[in-house]
């Protein structure tokens, strides 16, 4: 079904950073659709440098709570906490095992095309974007993860599900907890961003505010 422009804008106006959920669990079909939106999201070179961690276990939420100051109003009343992990430099080197798996097993490239893709990626990484150090490579992977998160929040809104993106957390402590829980392998992943999902307990306290299109758009014709 094709949505009208008005329906699309209605979805975007519905979405807001929900600070209070009503505690109801999401329907399984809704949550699976939101996850699928993340899975089907685009990524540079098609390398999908992310992993989605879905947290509902109360004990883990309690461990994360002191270090997630930006989500303390929603951690306990949301239906799901999503933690998106981003790949580290080790997995994003042109000749890494992970990228080899992606090219062969996921993208289905022939050995010849894998070699050509590896060379093109290496040239782009080194000469175009200067991604030769650990932190810039991880930050690039985080940027890819935000594409997936944006799609997940938009699809959630289209289903009448609310969300709240969270960057307010102590990364080192959250990664330590996830490592202790056997969820995160620090040689492969770091935490990119979090978000909570559920049903709003109350309407937004004020209307959505944004700059006008004229302020943020330059036309070159």
Model-predicted segments: where are they?
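Acidic, surface-exposed loops and disordered segments
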Residues: 1-221
